[in-house]
Swiss-Prot record:
Protein name listed in UniProt: Arrestin domain-containing protein B
SUPFAM superfamilies, alphabetized: C2 domain (Calcium/lipid-binding domain, CaLB), E set domains
Keyword Metal-binding in annotation: yes
Cofactor: Ca(2+)
Sorted UniProt keywords: Calcium, Metal-binding
Lineage: Eukaryota, Amoebozoa, Evosea, Eumycetozoa, Dictyostelia
A Gene Ontology biological process term: aggregation involved in sorocarp development
Chain residues that bind Ca(2+) 2: 20, 76, 78, 84
Name of the gene: adcB
Protein family per UniProt: Belongs to the arrestin family.
Gene Ontology CC entries for this record: cytoplasm; cytosol
InterPro entries hit by this protein: Arrestin-like_C, Arrestin-like_N, Arrestin_C-like, Arrestin_domain-protein, C2_dom, C2_domain_sf, Ig_E-set, SAM/pointed_sf
Disulfide bonds: none
SMART domains linked: Arrestin_C, C2
A Gene Ontology molecular function term of the record: cAMP-dependent protein kinase regulator activity
Length: 617
């Protein structure tokens, strides 16, 4: 049992339902119910966007109790009569507990009727933040930065920059080039979350010794309308040579650094403030774009410039934002011929992510003389940019016939599923800038009568940005080349995940992604790097995984060694083009050798070498 004190803050509301003056305003207040106790805020008059900023001590709570739920209801105050409900929502303590472990202190709650209420929360004792490990294995570097995140929202400043030591691998690149390496982007797009560190690496492949004056990487984010920048969200810069020349050097800006042939890896880290918007591209003329930019000033060689767009998600736009609010929509009509037709639509929640099915239960009760033929459901989207009110457009439409038709004094219940597309835009509200909202229009087709319909809102939210979806193992294994030299970084990842069944190599080692090793690079890097850096996440299986990789490597290097020992290095490329590995040498026939080389002397040398190999085995 984990008992903690909980203090709840009712901060503000937005887009609330209008209950007064023809729906243009309300006098809202919030009422909380928990364990038989009630709490109530002050009433804010004539507004749909109230600011309360009131706090309540909820008491000592068992945070592991799945039945611990706070009822949050927003009501419209009236001098006379009953106070109208503007909407309510169930707030499980478990949601607050999970959010607190990630450093969140507030959430927007979606009311079941219309609008949102923002609540803050504080546990006592507080939850420790989940520890973040830096690429050098030191958790303190990142933890110090997390402790300074509160400075961002209060004074607009970013926390102090964090620098990491560069990594050098003595490989043999063929061209001078650079690329950005993002965590976990081999299987799916990397998604960064606002309010958290943004980590990546810049890899510089050097094919000849060079001297660099500067290596700078920057993170920029902005919103734009009609191609014109409207707001700058973030702009930050890192000098990747900072650690190479020493941060305390008085002339660090003017010093040059020599880089040898090989793969130079520069891990870097930025921080995106919690209030920044989610990435948006292609919503009318409105865009929110984030990108990494890199510039290398190289002596006596052309500069290298590189940029890469990244995807950023504000946690408020994801499934973590919304508590589960039920759909319960009821409407009815009375035909002129008498009786009543009632339709009730229910669902356990009103928030869905793109690609998720919207499953609705439709119940029809017919006490009239009319016949009910079918139900039609239409998902509508309205996009309003700046102060231009958008027009609802149809996103998808489904219909379901009632067999048989619903006659007088009959009722029927049907499950209707709306399959949302994977590319569906999420609901957005940014005051005065953009608003994307969704509604479901349900129409009951009644024979010889005006149709009965109702409209109710739903939210489209982004899925969990940290969800990892692995590809099909059989597909991945079938794509791994027999020859390790031809492996891509993705092939190595699939080999570890699915052939060796050891995902811990990746999931338990935050610096694994930085190396982004191809098979050709595996042939040249030292064993110490493999054991102590790349494979250390395997734990007790490190030696086993290392030996398995060495077997794959030896199948290639042993062939090269034999050819070199017999003064036949010119045949190395031919053998590798034909995928001849060490385990196949003893099986090569004289016909095979004649295909590999047309020189009689070379064939005889090869035959003699292979005979010795058979005798030694």
């Amino acid at each position: 049992m984990d008992n903690r004190g909980l203090r709840l803050f009712i901060v503000e509301g937005k887009e609330l339902k209008g209950s007064d003056n023809g729906g243009s305003s309300s006098d809202p207040y919030v009422k909380l119910k928990f364990n038989g106790n009630s709490f109530k805020t002050e009433t804010i008059k004539n507004t749909l966007s109230p600011v309360w900023n009131q706090s309540f001590d909820i008491g000592i709570i068992n945070v592991n109790d799945p039945n611990a739920i706070i009822e949050v209801e927003c009501l419209d105050w009236d001098r006379f009569g009953k106070h109208d409900s503007l909407g309510k929502v169930q707030l499980p303590i478990a949601i607050l507990r999970e959010a607190a472990t990630f450093g969140q202190t507030d959430k927007w709650l979606n009311l079941d009727k219309k609008g949102y209420v923002r609540v803050g929360f504080q546990f006592n004792p507080p939850y420790p933040l989940q520890q973040h490990i830096s690429p050098d294995g030191n958790p303190n570097i990142i933890q110090n930065q997390i402790q300074q995140q509160n400075l961002i929202s209060s004074n607009g400043q970013l926390p102090p920059p964090v620098y990491y030591e560069p990594i050098y691998l003595k490989t043999h690149p063929t061209v001078l080039e650079a690329e950005f390496i993002l965590p976990n982007d081999l299987y799916q797009k990397t998604i960064y979350v606002t309010g958290e560190p943004v980590r990546a690496s810049l890899v510089l492949y050097v094919n000849q010794p060079i001297v660099v004056r500067s290596l700078f990487v920057s993170l920029k984010g902005k919103t734009s309308v009609c191609g014109k920048k409207q707001k700058e969200l973030i702009q930050d810069l890192r000098n990747l040579l900072h650690t190479s020349i020493g941060p305390s050097s008085p002339n660090s800006q003017n010093q040059k650094v020599a880089l040898d042939i090989g793969k130079h890896i520069y891990p870097f880290e930025f921080f995106i403030p919690k209030h920044c918007n989610s990435s948006i591209d292609g919503v009318g003329n409105y865009k929110v774009l984030y990108r990494f930019q890199f510039n290398a000033d190289i002596v006596n060689l052309p500069d290298i410039q590189l940029e890469r767009e990244i995807t950023v998600v504000n946690i408020e736009d994801t499934v973590h934002r919304m508590t589960q609010s039920q759909i319960h929509e009821k409407c009815s009509k009375s035909p002129l011929t008498g009786g009543t037709i009632e339709m009730t639509i229910t669902a356990p929640k009103n928030s869905y992510y793109p690609g998720e099915d919207i499953e609705l239960q439709v119940h029809v009760n017919n006490s009239s003389k009319k016949k009910v033929k079918k139900i039609e459901l239409e998902l509508q989207r309205t996009i309003s940019i700046q102060h231009e009110k958008g027009v609802p457009t149809q996103v998808l439409k489904v219909s379901k016939n009632f067999f048989p038709k619903i006659q007088q004094n009959q009722q029927s219940t049907q499950i209707v599923v709306m399959e949302t597309p994977q590319t569906l835009l999420n609901s957005i509200y940014q005051s005065g800038i953009i608003k994307i909202e969704y509604k479901v229009r349900a129409v009951l087709d009644i024979l010889d009568c005006i149709d009965l319909y109702t409209i109710f809102p739903v939210n489209i939210v982004l899925p969990d940005p940290k969800r990892v979806i692995l590809p099909n193992p059989l597909d991945e294994l079938s794509k791994i080349p027999r020859y390790i030299q031809d492996w891509t970084p993705r092939n190595l990842l699939s080999w570890l995940y699915f052939r060796m069944n050891c995902p811990e190599v990746v999931t338990s080692n935050p610096e694994f992604y930085q190396y982004c090793l191809s098979g050709n690079e595996l042939l040249s890097i030292p064993d110490t790097i493999l054991l102590e850096k790349v494979l250390k996440g395997a734990g007790t299986r490190t030696t086993e995984i290392h030996n398995a990789i060495k077997i794959e490597i030896d199948r290639v290097l042993s062939v090269r060694t034999i050819l070199k020992d017999n003064q036949l290095p010119h045949l190395i490329q031919t053998f590798e083009n034909e995928l001849v590995t060490f385990d196949l040498l003893s099986s090569l026939s004289s016909i095979d050798l004649s295909h590999l080389t047309s020189t009689i002397g070379d064939r005889i040398r090869l035959q003699n070498a292979f005979e010795k190999l058979k005798l030694n085995n």
